[in-house]
């Protein structure tokens, strides 16, 4: 049997997506690979199809239990002999699974890196001829990456312990340094690298200065989205609860998700989000990696992510079905201070902290870039594209203004107050605020006191952010977040450099100009009623089987059913995502709704 037959007869798809076939054929020729593929490009098929064609068993390394469980449920629905081993299962179950894999009864076995590299598992696998190790989220092995995990580094031993096994590594986010590090550690540079590109044309990007009324900014972004699924990322557990409560009072259907919740509640909230439409999950970064919900229509951040890689991964959870999806990032000076503080408090070595700070600098530069958001984002991954004409900067190009004198005001306030105060104090000096701290320090008597009072506090926050992004000032976390002047800042203060800044918009309703009234799903209004009925049927079946709804059929398959309206089993078998197993199980039930 060939790859095309597996695609048609097992997975129920007619054609491969871009790049899939070449990766699969390379693996079938027994060569190691690293595939960098954007979210939603279908990377799981790239290792699942070869695993079914190899005569021996394959092991998939996955970091999350939830992801393993979902993948196994999906594969079993297709009639594939697949299993997983993890700590949430009993020792008896795990032992039986391992024995079945050794006997050849299981073709695909999912393991976490910790489980795989344990002495016990390696001992059990030592006499097995394993065809392939497929490593998902492979960027976690690299110290160059933003998501380095020590347990992933142990995987570098696989090529020595199992020299005949193919190593297939997959990731959605890896710049050149990270890619080189992955193939060095996993394959000693003996791998073919596939880089499909990082662009997600269906995503629209926007960044806004976070105001005091940032929840109202969020509310405006959510206009016309009440029936859509979305994710809102917050920095703290407390904030997730607060935002979810705020949205529920505004008649949205929002649920919080964070590591501090009871495990059962957290699991129930995740299942609700996965199985139902119109749910907004308000989460910390504990949520998301490996979440396979295709119809997430928006992702919003209420504060700064940790890096460009983290931001790219998190917004990548929107629009996996290829339909338009929106993203919004709100951030302010305090977010930047918090992120710098997190890095400083981390127990990692100085080199790692330096790398984390550089990644944060890159994200800050992206946020303040006056050019196309997609151009700015993808340039970080060494990819050049034309302007997207779909982000806030393309739809409303920002004005660039001459700001040398304003910059000198801020720099002078920092210098004259001794470079030992944070942004709040510096802004109070510029505004001429007679606060107790200002008076106590005598800063109401320095020349720059009140020199910037014709501008607002929000303006100065945005302006100082741009100066930070330009590298003229820096935040010294070791000295309690004080602002300090850099070498280029000194040159600017001495009039040896000029400074232009992006016009600072302080309107909280800016968002409404950037977003379309309705997200098109490429389906006629007359078919929406049938689509709703098919989704209802899917939910009923999924609940009866205790599996996520997407395991039954993806949204894309349901949309195709609603549009094409298959009359019989032959027509139904032509729907993408309908293989022999699902045809047998579900065709009669779904056809009765379609033709009823």
Where are these regions (language model features)?
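Flexible coil/turn residues that form the inter-helical turn or adjacent wing/linker of helix-turn-helix
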Residues: 163, 226, 370, 419, ...
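Short, charged low-complexity linear segments at domain edges
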Residues: 351-381
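Accessory DNA-binding and partner-docking regions appended to nucleic-acid-acting proteins
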Residues: 1-3, 355-357, 384-596
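Helicase motor core with emphasis on the C-terminal RecA-like subdomain
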Residues: 3-10, 14-18, 22-44, 51-55, ...
């Amino acid at each position: 049997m060939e790859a095309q037959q597996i695609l048609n007869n097992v997975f129920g798809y007619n054609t491969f997506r871009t790049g899939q076939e070449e990766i699969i054929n390379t693996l079938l020729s027994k060569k190691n690979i690293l595939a960098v593929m954007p979210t939603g490009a279908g990377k799981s098929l790239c290792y699942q199809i070869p695993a079914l064609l190899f005569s021996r068993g394959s092991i998939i390394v996955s970091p999350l239990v939830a992801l393993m469980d979902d993948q196994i449920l999906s594969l079993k629905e297709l009639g594939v002999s697949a299993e997983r081993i993890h700590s949430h299962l009993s020792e008896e179950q795990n032992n039986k699974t391992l024995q079945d894999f050794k006997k050849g009864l299981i073709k695909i076995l999912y393991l976490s890196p910790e489980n795989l590299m344990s002495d016990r598992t390696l001992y059990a696998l030592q006499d097995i001829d394993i065809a392939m190790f497929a490593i998902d989220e492979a960027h976690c092995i690299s110290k160059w990456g933003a998501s380095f995990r020590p347990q992933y580094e142990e995987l570098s031993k696989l090529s020595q312990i199992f020299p005949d096994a193919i190593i297939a590594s997959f990731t959605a986010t890896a710049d050149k340094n990270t890619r080189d590090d992955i193939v060095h550690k996993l394959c000693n540079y003996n791998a073919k690298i596939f880089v499909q590109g990082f662009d997600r044309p269906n995503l629209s990007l926007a960044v806004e200065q976070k105001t005091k009324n940032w929840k109202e900014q969020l509310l405006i972004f959510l206009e016309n989205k009440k029936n859509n699924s979305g994710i809102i990322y917050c920095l703290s557990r407390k904030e997730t609860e607060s935002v979810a409560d705020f949205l529920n009072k505004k008649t949205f259907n929002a649920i919080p998700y964070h590591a501090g919740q009871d495990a059962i509640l957290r699991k129930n909230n995740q299942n609700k989000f996965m199985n139902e439409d119109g749910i907004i999950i308000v989460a910390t970064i504990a949520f998301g990696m490996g979440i396979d919900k295709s119809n997430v229509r928006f992702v919003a951040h209420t504060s700064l992510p940790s890096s460009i890689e983290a931001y790219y991964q998190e917004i990548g959870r929107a629009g996996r079905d290829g339909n338009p999806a929106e993203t919004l990032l709100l951030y302010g000076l305090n977010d930047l201070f918090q992120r710098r503080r997190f890095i400083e408090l981390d127990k990692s070595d100085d080199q790692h902290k330096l790398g984390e700070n550089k990644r944060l600098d890159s994200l800050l530069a992206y946020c303040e870039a006056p050019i196309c958001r997609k151009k700015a984002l993808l340039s970080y991954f060494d990819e050049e594209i034309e302007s997207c004409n779909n982000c806030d900067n393309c739809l409303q190009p920002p004005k660039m203004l001459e700001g040398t004198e304003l910059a000198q005001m801020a720099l002078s306030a920092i210098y004259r107050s001794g470079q030992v105060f944070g942004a709040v104090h510096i802004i109070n000096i510029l505004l001429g605020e007679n606060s107790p701290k200002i008076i106590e320090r005598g800063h109401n008597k320095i020349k720059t006191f009140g020199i910037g009072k014709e501008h607002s506090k929000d303006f100065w926050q945005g302006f100082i952010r741009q100066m930070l992004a330009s590298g003229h000032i820096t935040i010294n976390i070791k000295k309690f977040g004080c602002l300090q002047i850099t070498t280029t800042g000194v040159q600017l203060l001495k009039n040896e450099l000029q400074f232009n800044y992006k016009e600072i918009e302080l309107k909280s309703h800016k968002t409404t100009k950037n977003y379309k009234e309705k997200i098109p799903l490429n389906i006629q209004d007359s078919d929406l009623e049938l689509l709703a009925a098919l989704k209802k049927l899917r939910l009923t079946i999924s609940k009866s089987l205790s599996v996520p709804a997407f395991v039954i059929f993806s949204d894309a398959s349901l949309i195709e059913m609603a549009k094409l309206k298959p009359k019989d089993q032959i027509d139904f078998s032509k729907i993408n995502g309908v293989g022999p197993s699902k045809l047998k199980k579900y065709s009669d039930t779904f056809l009765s709704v379609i033709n009823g």
